[in-house]
Amino acid sequence: MSVKTYPIFTFRWLAVHALAVPTVFFLGSITAMQFIQR
């Protein structure tokens, strides 16, 4: 199974990471603010 078999998988991979990375960063900053306030 090669990574460059279908461009759709690459596009889906980019889309998932484009949505997942800011979400994880957003949740991380929220938890950090929660700990800082307490």
Swiss-Prot record:
The record describes its membrane topology as: Single-pass membrane protein
List of residues binding heme: 17
Q: A Pfam family in this protein?
A: Cytochrom_B559
Q: Name one GO cellular component term.
A: photosystem II reaction center
Record note on cofactor: With its partner (PsbE) binds heme. PSII binds additional chlorophylls, carotenoids and specific lipids.
Q: Which InterPro entries match?
A: PSII_cyt_b559_bsu, PSII_cyt_b559_CS, PSII_cyt_b559_N
Keyword presence, Electron transport: yes
Give GO terms for biological process: photosynthetic electron transport chain
Membrane-spanning residues where?
A: 13-29
| Cofactors | heme b
Q: Where in the cell does this protein reside? A: Plastid, Chloroplast thylakoid membrane
| GO function term, MF aspect, one | electron transfer activity
Task: Give the UniProt keywords, A-Z.
Answer: Chloroplast, Electron transport, Heme, Iron, Membrane, Metal-binding, Photosynthesis, Photosystem II, Plastid, Thylakoid, Transmembrane, Transmembrane helix, Transport
- Subunit relationships: Heterodimer of an alpha subunit and a beta subunit. PSII is composed of 1 copy each of membrane proteins PsbA, PsbB, PsbC, PsbD, PsbE, PsbF, PsbH, PsbI, PsbJ, PsbK, PsbL, PsbM, PsbT, PsbX, PsbY, PsbZ, Psb30/Ycf12, at least 3 peripheral proteins of the oxygen-evolving complex and a large number of cofactors. It forms dimeric complexes.
Say what the protein does: This b-type cytochrome is tightly associated with the reaction center of photosystem II (PSII). PSII is a light-driven water:plastoquinone oxidoreductase that uses light energy to abstract electrons from H(2)O, generating O(2) and a proton gradient subsequently used for ATP formation. It consists of a core antenna complex that captures photons, and an electron transfer chain that converts photonic excitation into a charge separation.
Checking NCBIfam families in the record gives: cyt_b559_beta
The record's similarity note reads: Belongs to the PsbE/PsbF family.
Protein name as it appears in the record = Cytochrome b559 subunit beta
Give the organism, scientific name: Ostreococcus tauri
